[in-house]
Amino acid sequence: MKKYILPLVLVAALTGCESIYLPTLKEVPVYPTNRTQAEEGHSGSYHLASRHWTDVSKIRDEATRLSYEVSQGKLTKVQAAQYLNRYRIQLVGRNAVDDSVYEVYLRSAVDSQRGAISTEQSKLYIQNTLKGWQQRWPNMQSKPTNPAFTNFLMEVMGMEPLK
């Protein structure tokens, strides 16, 4: 339980600031970098990448570090969200699921930071997005092998991860 406290603090911290900052979303997922074996022409059932849960743990550790920076006033919540996104792209690459979830995560942080939504509304916004991916996941044709950012947030929110 203790390992979830700091990521939960990060989620809360990223959603409760009231300064105004509106970043532009410049990154567009054109070519996902971690595709499934089926996409690459291999047969067999779907499996997450062997390093997936290690990557989820690394993202959690980075989120914890960024949460501390936000609590010290060194970063805004939106800046922390952007740093976390750069970290996850560097760590696991891009994929449609993580890119989509990050877009909602950033929008939620921006809206919360400028006072348009509450921390609770921000959390619900992210949870609804995650629930949507849980519903789509079983029927997806091209599942990414390493949706680490999405599963990190699933873990933080106490939801069943994508498998």
List where the protein language model places each region:
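Sec-dependent bacterial lipoprotein signal peptides
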Residues: 1-18
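Mature extracellular/secreted ectodomains of secretory-pathway proteins
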Residues: 60, 64-153
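Intrinsically disordered, low-complexity segments enriched in glycine/proline and serine/threonine
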Residues: 5-9, 30, 82, 124
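Non-catalytic interaction surface on structured domains
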Residues: 4, 21-23, 111
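Post-signal-peptide N-terminal segment of Sec-exported extracytoplasmic proteins
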Residues: 24, 36-77, 81
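Bacterial Sec signal peptide processing site at the extreme N-terminus
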Residues: 15-37
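Short, solvent-exposed mixed-charge patches
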Residues: 160-163
